[in-house]
Each structure stands twice: as structure tokens, then as C-alpha cells.
């Protein structure tokens, strides 16, 4: 039964909101999850990738469509690099609806309450808590909580309402789901080229009986074209049209990718998590794993603050400090991405691929490559691969200072 007063109200019942609610209820706190859509896991707005560490936390292996252990990467001119070890899982391609439902169900089984077709209308922080009005199927009702948490995505209502700033980067992604793509089981495909993914890459991810094909970039690199337009350029290009000629579209998705943590994810009695905080990885756009990591890092001090109803400035500062490593690592990952990809011309990318294709470099990638943490591999290549040393000065400041 839905109550009027909770310890925590979480706006957004996606995987990060569900995970947060689960962990808080496990600690004995009362939690209300609020989801604006009539069902969990819809609409679907990402590539459906869950990294191993995130999957280990949930154990939702029955939601897996394909285990990804390797990749085929292509330079703008078509140089192919094949990486991966079938014995090492790099990431999981999942059914996001089932995965999201599984995470939210964990929170419900642990004692959280859930409101569907509901959204916040207004909220006000007081000395003792947060007063919030929710629109529940068209009816406005009042609630109170000690803390309000936003896990409500790139355009977070919580973040905007409390003027918590904007993520450093807001990229745009577009994806279609198709049948008929001649992929290789267990390997995803990555395509680089300014014509169809300026500064970034396009992908083809095996997902059970279908393949998810998409691209992403920064708005200022797209000019007057959309990611959808540029994806068609890839699929119809003389170089790659044979790869896509038998594809039949069965679904499409478009959405923002916020990457660059906001200055203070916690203010007063309000906190934002995951995409709402700008936590997507600058190298892949993935956000679930980093959102889970944020929750785990903040959890002990978060539970203490909520339990004691202590949200003094020093407590809030301590909460923000718990995730400072996430910010530094995100900045370093972005610096490496810029050096090796975003700031490179097609000609420079072809040169980089000619180095990456060397057997000793592929061995290094297979040894140190980590979809969660590209920093060790990037640092090792800058240090040990002679052809990459000229890039080191470009990345030095960001890599050192984060």
C-alpha cells in the first residue's frame, strides 16, 4: 500500500533507479519508486549493453541475448582489426526490458513501493525533508521524504528543477534493430569515419536473432544532418553497402547520451544518479555500470545521512566526495577518447589503425582492454608503442590532472 511519507523517493524506475531503491531498502529504509511510463523498460533507448561487473551485481543472466567477447573494428579506409578471446566476456547484449524489470523487481522484493504512470509536478526542500507533488494517472497527490533522488535520465526533471547544472557533454545517438546482418557470433562491429560518425563510431551489436546498428556523435559535429541521416550514409556507402544489403528494420530508437558528471550530484536533500548526473562513459556511451558504481560508492554515507536525517553542508560535501574518483576517471577516459578518436581526422585514424593492427599491439589490447576502464590500456599504448608517443603531449594534462 502506497504511503504518504517515505525515507526516500526515487524518480525514475530504470535500472539505476531500481538498483538504488534495492540497495536502500536492503538497509532498512522505506523507498517509493516513481516511473512516468505505464510499464518498466519502455521506451527502450540504448544499445542494450551491460558490462560484466554490472551483470555480476544483478545476476540477470537469463536476460542475455548474446555474450560479447570480441570485436571487428574498421578504419575509415576499411582496415580491419579483429580482437577478443572467446574465453573472456567483454560485455553482455541483453533484452533491456527484461533486464530493467529484473532490477526493479529486486527492489520490490526488498520492500520498495512502485508508482507507474506517475511523474513529479513540484518539489520543495524544507528543514526536515522534501515535500513533493506527484501526478498519478492525472490525480495530484502530496508526499514527503527525507531525501529525493533523481534517476530520471538525460533530461532529468530533478536535476533541472533544482538547478544542478548540465553534463559536460550531451551526445546524440541513433539506433535501428535489424534482421539479416552478417555478423560474427560473439563479436560486435565498430566502424569509424567522418562521413557517418564524425569524431566517434558506428556499431553493429549482435542481439540474439537481430542486430542493433547505430551511431553517435556530438551535436556540433553533426552540422545540419542527424545521426539517422548519417547512419544511412554508412549503410548505403560503396564500401559497406554489401554488409547491410539484406537488413530489414524491425525497430528504431534515438536518444541523448550525457557524459560529464555535473559539479555537485548532491545538494541539500537532493541527489541525482546515472544519466541524470552525466555519468555515461565518454568512450562507449554506456551508463548502467557507472550508475551502479555510483550507488555502491555513495551507499554507506547515504544510508547514514538518511537514517540520521543529517544533511548539513559537511555531510553533503562528504557525499559528493565519495564519487570524486568517478569524475577523475571519466575525464581521463574522455582525454584518451579525444586523442585516439574524436580529434583525429580520417587520415590520422587510418594511421592509428595501421599501428593497432600490428600483432604486438593486438596482444596488448587483448591483455589490457577493458570496456569499463580504458585508462590502463590507453596509458600503456602512449608509453610503450613508439608510434603513439607523439600523441602523449596532447593527453598529458587531462590524464595527469583528470
Provide a role label for each language-model segment.
Residues 41, 57-72, 165-170, 313-315:
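A short alpha-helix-loop-beta-strand transition element characteristic
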Residues 22-44:
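Glycine-rich FAD pyrophosphate-binding loop
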Amino acid at each position: 500500500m502506497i504511503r504518504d511519507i517515505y525515507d526516500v523517493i526515487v524518480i525514475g524506475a530504470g535500472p539505476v533507479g531500481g538498483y538504488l531503491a534495492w540497495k536502500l531498502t536492503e538497509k532498512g529504509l522505506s523507498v517509493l519508486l516513481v516511473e512516468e511510463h505505464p510499464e518498466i523498460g519502455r521506451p527502450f533507448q540504448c544499445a542494450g549493453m551491460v558490462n560484466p561487473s554490472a551483470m555480476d551485481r544483478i545476476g540477470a543472466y537469463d536476460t542475455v541475448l548474446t555474450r560479447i567477447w570480441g570485436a571487428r573494428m574498421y578504419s575509415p579506409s576499411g582496415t580491419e582489426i579483429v580482437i577478443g578471446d572467446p574465453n573472456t566476456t567483454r560485455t553482455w547484449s541483453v533484452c533491456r526490458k527484461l533486464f530493467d524489470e529484473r532490477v526493479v523487481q529486486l527492489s520490490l522484493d526488498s520492500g520498495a513501493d512502485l508508482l507507474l504512470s506517475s511523474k513529479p509536478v513540484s518539489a520543495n526542500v524544507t528543514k526536515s525533508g522534501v515535500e513533493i507533488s506527484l501526478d498519478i494517472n492525472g490525480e495530484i497527490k502530496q508526499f514527503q521524504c527525507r531525501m529525493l533522488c533523481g534517476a530520471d535520465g538525460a533530461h532529468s526533471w530533478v536535476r533541472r528543477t533544482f538547478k544542478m547544472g548540465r553534463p559536460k557533454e550531451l551526445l546524440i545517438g541513433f539506433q535501428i534493430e535489424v534482421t539479416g546482418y552478417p555478423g560474427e557470433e560473439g563479436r560486435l562491429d565498430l566502424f569509424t569515419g567522418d562521413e557517418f560518425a564524425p569524431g566517434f563510431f558506428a556499431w553493429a551489436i549482435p542481439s540474439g536473432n537481430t542486430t542493433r546498428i547505430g551511431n553517435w556523435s556530438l551535436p556540433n559535429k553533426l552540422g545540419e544532418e542527424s545521426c539517422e541521416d548519417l547512419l544511412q550514409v554508412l549503410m548505403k556507402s560503396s564500401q559497406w553497402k554489401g554488409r547491410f544489403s539484406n537488413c530489414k528494420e524491425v525497430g528504431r530508437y534515438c536518444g541523448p547520451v550525457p557524459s560529464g558528471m555535473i559539479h555537485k550530484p548532491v545538494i541539500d536533500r537532493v541527489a541525482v544518479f546515472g544519466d541524470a548526473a552525466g555519468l555515461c562513459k565518454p568512450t562507449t556511451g554506456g551508463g548502467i555500470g557507472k550508475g551502479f558504481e555510483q550507488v555502491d560508492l555513495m551507499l554507506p554515507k547515504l544510508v547514514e545521512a538518511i537514517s540520521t536525517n543529517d544533511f548539513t553542508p559537511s555531510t553533503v560535501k562528504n557525499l559528493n566526495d565519495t564519487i570524486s574518483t568517478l569524475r577523475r576517471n571519466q575525464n581521463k577516459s574522455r582525454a584518451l577518447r579525444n586523442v585516439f578518436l574524436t580529434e583525429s581526422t580520417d587520415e590520422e585514424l587510418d594511421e592509428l589503425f595501421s599501428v593497432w593492427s600490428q600483432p604486438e599491439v593486438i596482444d596488448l589490447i587483448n591483455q589490457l582492454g577493458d570496456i569499463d576502464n580504458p585508462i590502463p590500456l590507453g596509458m600503456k599504448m602512449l608509453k610503450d608503442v613508439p608510434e603513439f608517443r607523439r600523441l602523449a603531449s596532447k593527453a598529458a594534462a587531462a590524464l595527469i590532472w583528470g
